[in-house]
Amino acid sequence: MELETHLSKYFTLAFTHKSMSLEMREKLAINSNATLKEFLQTIKNHCPNIKECMVLSTCNRFEIYASLKHGANTNEQKNALLKILAQNKKMSVSDLEKCVLMNTDESAVHHVFSVCSSLDSLVVGETQITGQMKNAYKFAFEEKFCSKDLTRLLHFAFKCAAKVRNLTGISKQGVSISSVAVKEALNIFEKERIKDKKALVIGLGEMAQLVIKHLLNKQFEALILGRNAAKFEDFIKELEEPKKVSFQNIENLNAYINEYELLFCATSSPHFIVQNRMLKETIFRRFWFDLAVPRNIEKPVLDNIFLYSVDDLEPMVRENVENRQESRMRAYEIVGLATMEFYQWIQSLEVEPVIKDLRELARISAQKELQKALKKRYVPKEYENNIEKILHNAFNTFLHNPTIALKKNAQKEESDVLVGAIKNLFNLDKSNANHAQNLNLYKCEYYEE
């Protein structure tokens, strides 16, 4: 739906597990801040009609969120971004075109709110996505690729996600890919009658930490292979049973890779961590879970190794989705309402309506006082038109500097607070002003985590 307004035009491009294979998502994935900054800078350099931009890259999706300059053609922006992606990732534009989902304006806002609320996730209700979006926004904001427009959008998205979690039961069951993987591992453990409840975990990022917590919850012991011993020491302080977890440097991978029946791998490496040249024959069967995108485990050549990728877990997720249909429906109602409220709030913060309302308030006040003066015969009736002109010129002169200042600050980060304060001071649309006043946008929720 195209809005007939000068409000910011929101725009999203999405490649997800629903539309794109794991192999293609691997090519799109960005796993380092340096690469992400370079990609965002390329967009900034080659897409002058994109005002602000951020990228969300996870194991299940690659998405670009942007605000466009007024009058920008959305199809032209899509084509430009697909061309940049194709060149950057050595893919064809036609392949990307087949998989991309574009949203603009209200549908873009609804999409961002749905993603943040985990309604578009492989595991509906998983809470990891909100944190990933906060990190993506934080990076783009701090590197100055986004400002007021996306801050407004993401701040409201975080509020919407919190409301969905609080008002529905959508996050009460299995809540992440990691929990589904551990649940499947437990089923394998019981079916295979494995003696020792032990697992090898490669990585110590957010996904790996979730795996470890789920393993401990199921009474497993875990050996972690990573690069940062200090990070491990900080992590185990969060655990109820830290003695069930041990750490070795990942350089010792060869010494452990053939010793465990259960293995979970989740690192940000763009290359295979576990390679076939490391493998030896074992008398026991092995079950490996590769939760990384790009994948960290080379497809095993040994017959007794069973490898599960992120996409392989999808059938195990379907039951999770079916169990949450009622919660999903309620959640989508909340997202729909939040989308409407977002645009109402944005419109309440626009500078032009405030300037118009201020001038109208001045005109009404002047006219009211003039009529009082005429009624009490302080001035003759025949002078009414001349006095109206004098008053009109007077309040125009009075409001000239504030008008210039408001227009000058319209695109600055503090404009929302400024407009909210003016509306509150002059009682202009008081309900909306109070709402704006309660939202301190530049202390965004990501600072709380």
From Swiss-Prot:
Listed pathway(s): Porphyrin-containing compound metabolism; protoporphyrin-IX biosynthesis; 5-aminolevulinate from L-glutamyl-tRNA(Glu): step 1/2
Keyword Oxidoreductase applies: yes
Site, as annotated: Important for activity: H111
Tagged with keyword Transferase: no
PROSITE patterns tied to this protein: GLUTR
GO molecular function: glutamyl-tRNA reductase activity; NADP binding
Alphabetic keyword roster: NADP, Oxidoreductase, Porphyrin biosynthesis
EC number per UniProt: 1.2.1.70
Binding residues annotated for substrate, in chain numbering: T58, C59, N60, R61, S121, E126, T127, Q128, Q132
Pfam families (alphabetical): GlutR_dimer (PF00745), GlutR_N (PF05201), Shikimate_DH (PF01488)
Active site: C59
Further details from the record: During catalysis, the active site Cys acts as a nucleophile attacking the alpha-carbonyl group of tRNA-bound glutamate with the formation of a thioester intermediate between enzyme and glutamate, and the concomitant release of tRNA(Glu). The thioester intermediate is finally reduced by direct hydride transfer from NADPH, to form the product GSA.
Functional summary from the UniProt entry: Catalyzes the NADPH-dependent reduction of glutamyl-tRNA(Glu) to glutamate 1-semialdehyde (GSA).
Entry's free-text remark on domains: Possesses an unusual extended V-shaped dimeric structure with each monomer consisting of three distinct domains arranged along a curved 'spinal' alpha-helix. The N-terminal catalytic domain specifically recognizes the glutamate moiety of the substrate. The second domain is the NADPH-binding domain, and the third C-terminal domain is responsible for dimerization.
Subunit: Homodimer.
Listed HAMAP family: Glu_tRNA_reductase
PANTHER family associated with the record: GLUTAMYL-TRNA REDUCTASE 1, CHLOROPLASTIC (PTHR43120:SF1)
Protein name per its UniProtKB record: Glutamyl-tRNA reductase
